[in-house]
Amino acid sequence: MPVKRSLKLDDQFEKNSFSPSKIVRKKSITAYSPTTGTYQLSPFSSPATPKEQEHRNGPSNETRKRSNLSSPVRQESTVKDRDGFMVLLSKIEISSEKTMEIMKNLSSIQALEGNRQLEDLIGVSLVPCSLKSEARKTKELMTKVIKQKLFEKKKSRITPKDHHLDSFEFLKAILN
């Protein structure tokens, strides 16, 4: 017995007209790595455009430019940084003195002195002159570091008597 079959294409077309299309986009060739033979997992893992790449490398390029400066300019900047740091330390000492005076004058703080709640509230313990002593210690360490660096610079310089222009004199100095 023959069976009649009819294709009902119109009905299926109407049902699927509002569903999302199944068109698959081709993968970009820029996302393919010939070295590893793989595709990029995330489109956001590395910049695709050259402008984004420049923006990404911006700070490192600036760092490289700064490192290429001549040594006198670098020395001036480090001296300025050290001087600025010392100025800040002296300001901290002055402000710590003022802070300690204010804390002594406040009667409510004096009543709570030694209480753990006050230390938790302020964030530091009320050890007398703790800020001042810490700033003084930091200042002393900075001066020691500066003196050490200056000593190392003087020590590392080649004096004219140590510098031999002739290879014969150099070998003679080594043997003696």
From Swiss-Prot:
Disordered: annotated segments: 34-78
Comp. bias (Basic and acidic residues): 51-65
Tissue specificity field: Expressed in the spermatogonia and spermatocytes.
Motif LXXIL motif: where in chain: 171-175
InterPro entries linked: CENP-R (IPR009601)
GO cellular component, one term: kinetochore
The keyword Repressor appears for this protein: yes
Signal sequence coordinates: none
Motif position, Nuclear localization signal: 63-66
Localization, UniProt: Nucleus; Chromosome, Centromere; Chromosome, Centromere, Kinetochore
Parts forming coiled coils: 82-112
Keyword hit for Ubl conjugation: yes
UniProt keyword annotations, A-Z: Activator, Apoptosis, Cell cycle, Cell division, Centromere, Chromosome, Coiled coil, Isopeptide bond, Kinetochore, Mitosis, Nucleus, Phosphoprotein, Repressor, Transcription, Transcription regulation, Ubl conjugation
Region (DD1): 20-50
GO biological process: apoptotic process; cell division; CENP-A containing chromatin assembly; chromosome segregation; negative regulation of epithelial cell apoptotic process; positive regulation of epithelial cell proliferation; regulation of DNA-templated transcription
Glycyl lysine isopeptide (Lys-Gly) (interchain with G-Cter in SUMO2) crosslink residues: K8, K22
Compositionally skewed regions (Polar residues) per UniProt: 34-48
UniProt remark on domains: The DD1 domain (also called RepD1 domain) mediates the corepressor function and is essential in the triggering of apoptosis. Contains one Leu-Xaa-Xaa-Ile-Leu (LXXIL) motif, which is essential for the association with nuclear receptors.
Quaternary organization: Homodimer; mediated by the coiled coil domain. Interacts with CCNA2 and MTA1. Interacts with NFKB1 NF-kappa-B subunit. Component of the CENPA-CAD complex, composed of CENPI, CENPK, CENPL, CENPO, CENPP, CENPQ, CENPR and CENPS. The CENPA-CAD complex interacts with the CENPA-NAC complex, at least composed of CENPA, CENPC, CENPH, CENPM, CENPN, CENPT and CENPU. Interacts with TASOR.
Reported function: Transcription coregulator that can have both coactivator and corepressor functions. Involved in the coactivation of nuclear receptors for retinoid X (RXRs) and thyroid hormone (TRs) in a ligand-dependent fashion. In contrast, it does not coactivate nuclear receptors for retinoic acid, vitamin D, progesterone receptor, nor glucocorticoid. Acts as a coactivator for estrogen receptor alpha. Acts as a transcriptional corepressor via its interaction with the NFKB1 NF-kappa-B subunit, possibly by interfering with the transactivation domain of NFKB1.
Protein name: Centromere protein R
Species the sequence originates in: Mus musculus
